[in-house]
């Protein structure tokens, strides 16, 4: 388990913190297909999460997915601990040529739109932590795929770190905590409150 400790904002007490633990399993990188993550940011983030013992999940889209696929392919250590979930066979073949393990994770008979949606849900289901870069620079808003990943993670009580200029609204369902991840990446932790009866996710 990896434990994060984040200052609780708005309390007036610098010592009050929210602590939560995440299995050191898989972190999913996701975000806008038009998004741009600077190469140094992606490299530092991947290196830090690798040191904590995480493996990596990422999708087959351009934009944010593509940046992290490239970063993860640069070292043997991250390459062997990365799985790329694909919506289409053509993408899996192309990505496989980069050295990363890529596989189609949806049935062949579904429509392209449904395939993209089911790929996202498949990846969120298998992640322990979601790192989300949802802002679409063309619209200034979150993309639909990013919103889907965000809500799916919260439905499954999984924490999300969101790098965005449009933070989620406050909610009784989760803590919303501004933070600087690893001391360099500004964003917001969205940490669902525990539910005694378990999660509200279902088989996807």
What are these regions (language model features)?
Residues 1-6, 199:
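Glycine- and charge-rich intrinsically disordered segments
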Residues 174-204:
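Leloir-type glycosyltransferase catalytic cores
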């Amino acid at each position: 388990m990896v434990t994060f400790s984040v200052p609780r904002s708005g309390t007036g007490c610098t010592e009050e913190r929210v602590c939560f633990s995440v299995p050191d399993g898989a972190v999913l990188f996701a975000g806008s297909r038009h998004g741009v993550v600077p190469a140094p940011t992606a490299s530092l983030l991947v290196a830090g999460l690798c040191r904590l013992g995480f493996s990596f999940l990422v999708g087959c889209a351009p934009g944010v997915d593509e940046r992290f696929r490239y970063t993860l392919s640069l070292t043997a250590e991250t390459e062997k601990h990365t799985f790329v979930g694909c919506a289409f066979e053509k993408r899996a073949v192309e990505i496989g040529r980069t050295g990363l393990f890529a596989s189609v994770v949806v049935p062949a008979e579904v429509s392209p739109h449904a395939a993209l949606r089911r790929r996202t849900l498949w990846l969120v289901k298998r992640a322990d932590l979601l790192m989300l870069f949802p802002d679409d620079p063309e619209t200034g808003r979150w993309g639909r795929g990013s919103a889907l990943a965000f809500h799916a993670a919260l439905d499954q009580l999984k924490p999300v770190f969101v790098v965005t200029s449009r933070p989620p609204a406050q909610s009784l369902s989760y803590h919303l905590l501004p933070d600087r991840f690893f001391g360099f990446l500004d964003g917001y932790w969205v940490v669902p409150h525990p539910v005694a009866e378990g999660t509200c996710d279902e088989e996807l």
